[in-house]
């Protein structure tokens, strides 16, 4: 199996990752794949794509089985300071982190700690219900499939300001409970009945993270470190900037004006 991984600077912070430890993948010194024969074309394509889409920095790895067969770094991690992307650059992965969030929850499912059709209110410290359909329970399956009816209200979803000083529990209760400071029945929920329609929801994914905390009785980042990152030797993957020793290694996110 051939796996091609792209990491590039993004505008939102959720999880960071970089090239894994040397024990995780073996570098294939022979590089006897067709990609090496077409390397110049691949580089030309990547650079043209970066120009077209105004991508400041980019890393590419091609993995075959457990071997890194090709990797290269392009552009800048920090344009203002003229810092180039290198093998130690940490990238903000944005919604790719939902694969980790989902994995964390499903690990707990495999331990028979809940059922996918369970009402999430059985496990939360506060109640969540759709204002138009209060008698229809929101289930784990709905959260994982983005059919919960919970909507993203971007006016109260800060994601540019680094690590939040607000606990996940507090933020979500303010967003989802009727007496919460961030609650708005019209904008925080869709018009659809829970389970009826797909609506991509970052708040729903955050709620999955809170459920991991409540069921595992561990902070979400601690659970992921102990049960996902450490076992997989993802030694440079983090949920918080405060966990990173050298912040200069983080590719600065940019946004088009």
Where are these regions (language model features)?
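Extracytoplasmic/periplasmic, Sec-exported soluble proteins
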Residues: 34-41, 54, 85-88, 92-100, ...
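Short, conserved catalytic-motif segment at the N-terminal edge
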Residues: 31-91, 115, 181-189
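Active-site SXXK
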Residues: 40-46, 60, 66, 90-120, ...
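Bacterial Sec-dependent signal peptides at the C-terminal "C-region" and cleavage site
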Residues: 4-14
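Short, surface-exposed loop or secondary-structure junction motifs
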Residues: 78, 132-257
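Acidic/histidine-rich, surface-exposed loop or edge segments in extracytoplasmic proteins
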Residues: 20-31
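Short, glycine/proline-biased beta-turn/loop segments that scaffold the active-site neighborhood
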Residues: 116-131, 231-232
């Amino acid at each position: 199996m051939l796996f091609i991984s792209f990491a590039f600077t993004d505008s939102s912070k959720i999880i960071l990752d970089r090239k894994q430890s040397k024990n995780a993948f073996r570098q294939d010194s022979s590089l006897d794949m067709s990609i090496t024969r077409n390397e110049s074309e691949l580089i030309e394509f990547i650079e043209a794509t970066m120009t077209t889409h105004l991508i400041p920095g980019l890393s590419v790895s091609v993995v075959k089985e457990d071997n890194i067969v090709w990797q290269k770094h392009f552009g800048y991690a920090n344009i203002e300071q003229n810092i180039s992307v290198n093998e130690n650059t940490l990238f903000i992965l944005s919604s790719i982190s939902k694969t980790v969030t989902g994995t964390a929850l499903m690990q707990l499912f495999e331990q028979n700690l809940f059922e996918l059709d369970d009402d999430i209110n059985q496990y939360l410290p506060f109640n969540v219900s759709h204002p138009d359909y209060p008698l229809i329970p929101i289930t784990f399956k709905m959260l994982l499939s983005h059919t919960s009816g919970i909507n993203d209200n971007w006016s109260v979803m800060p994601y540019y300001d680094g690590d939040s000083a607000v606990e996940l529990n507090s933020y979500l209760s303010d967003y989802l409970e009727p007496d919460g400071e961030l609650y708005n029945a019209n904008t925080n929920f869709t018009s659809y009945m829970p389970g009826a329609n797909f609506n991509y929801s970052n708040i729903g994914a955050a709620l999955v993270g809170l459920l991991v905390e409540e069921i595992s009785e561990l902070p979400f980042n601690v659970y992921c470190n102990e049960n996902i990152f450490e076992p997989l030797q993802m030694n440079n993957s983090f949920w918080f900037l405060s966990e990173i020793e050298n912040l200069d290694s983080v590719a600065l996110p940019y946004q088009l004006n």
